Amino acid sequence: MIDCHIRLQQGQFSLDQHFQSDHTVIGLFGASGSGKTTILHSIAGIITPQSGWIKVQNQTWFDHCQKINLSTQQRRVGLVFQDAQLFPHKNVMQNLLFGFKHIQPQQRQFEVDYIVELLKLGHLIDRMPIKLSGGEKQRVALGRALLYSPQLLLLDEPLSALDAAHKAEIIPFFQKVIQDIKIPMLYVSHDKAEIEQLTDVMWYL
């Protein structure tokens, strides 16, 4: 369950949004500049709202009145951005293991081999990011986020940088992850059809 009320002011930009849902995969839809990424950054702990609260799975991550503000590390969210943001000097396997190595063994929900097979990355594990297509990079970024065993997966326009062919290639992998892995997800996009295809419910900004 996600329950958040985020209020903040950044220069001329003002945000005051309240969302609550028990659905597993939530879509956040709105035009560019409507505050979608700001909401994700607030939930992740990258930005601190001026007031409000953020509760995920009955745990309070932020509450202005109660003076609660967990760090990004304490929240343990998985982030996937539109440009993948892989480490260019690390191969695919090293990228996949980055978050995995930074959590305790008892916190790990998935084996590396399971995620590699789920996302069909076996033939790519020794490649450097520069040798990957856009769709392959996003699969690696998704795998890296999942291996961090997040309490919440935040996907910020993960397909917007891909052409139609690469979108068609990667959407089945997202659908497979949604079907097989029951991690709450917040999926941001300005593409309404994409959100309708991949999420359980849509929030409008």
Feature names for model-found ranges:
Residues L142:
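Hydrophobic anchor residue at the start of the ABC signature
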Residues W61-G78, H102:
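ABC ATPase NBD coupling module
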Residues M128-L132, E136:
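Conserved ABC ATPase signature
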Residues K182-V188:
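Conserved H-loop
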Residues L153-E157:
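Catalytic Walker B motif of ABC-type/P-loop ATPase nucleotide-binding domains
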Residues H64, Q107-L124, Q175-K176:
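Conserved ABC ATPase "signature" region
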Residues L147-Q151:
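A short, proline-enriched helix->beta-strand linker immediately N-terminal to the Walker B motif
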